Amino acid sequence: MDPVQIRSLSLEALAYLGDAVWELHVRTRVLLPPRRLQWLHGDTVACVRASAQAKLATCLSPHLTVEEADWLRRGRNAGGTVPRRLDPATYRLATAFEALLGYLFLADRDRLGVILHLCDEFQHHHGPDTPSPEA
């Protein structure tokens, strides 16, 4: 997809795509070592919940290019209905994280791989729902 087409997409559409990218990445990552399905599911849910995504967005910020930081900012400011059970700031950061991944999936798969690796490293060292070092 060319840059003009990507920019024509709504931030919600990019977040929709980014949600799928992140979930598939996490599901692939948790497959090894082999475990029961319930453990795979539990590990996946811990990593893809909004609070974990919001922490990743915060931790990624210093590693982003100017353009990526702009996509993250735009994603955070996107409209949308916040689920009642979530803090609005957490939801918006999680949406920003997903929008960034959606953008990178369409625009730069190599860079997406770098960002996903950074996310994996953070979650490996700190756990999916551990407060970020900056918090």
UniProtKB/Swiss-Prot annotation:
EC number(s) on file: 3.1.26.-
BP GO terms, sorted: rRNA processing
Disulfide bonds, paired cysteine numbers: none
Active-site residues, as the UniProt record annotates them: D19
Cofactor(s) essential for the protein: Mg(2+)
CC per GO annotation: cytoplasm
S-adenosyl-L-methionine found in the keyword field: no
One Pfam family matching this protein: Ribonuclease_3
Record function comment: Involved in correct processing of both the 5' and 3' ends of 23S rRNA precursor. Processes 30S rRNA precursor transcript even in absence of ribonuclease 3 (Rnc); Rnc processes 30S rRNA into smaller rRNA precursors.
Subunit structure: Homodimer.
Assigned protein family: Belongs to the MrnC RNase family.
Protein name listed in UniProt: Mini-ribonuclease 3
Gene coding for it: mrnC
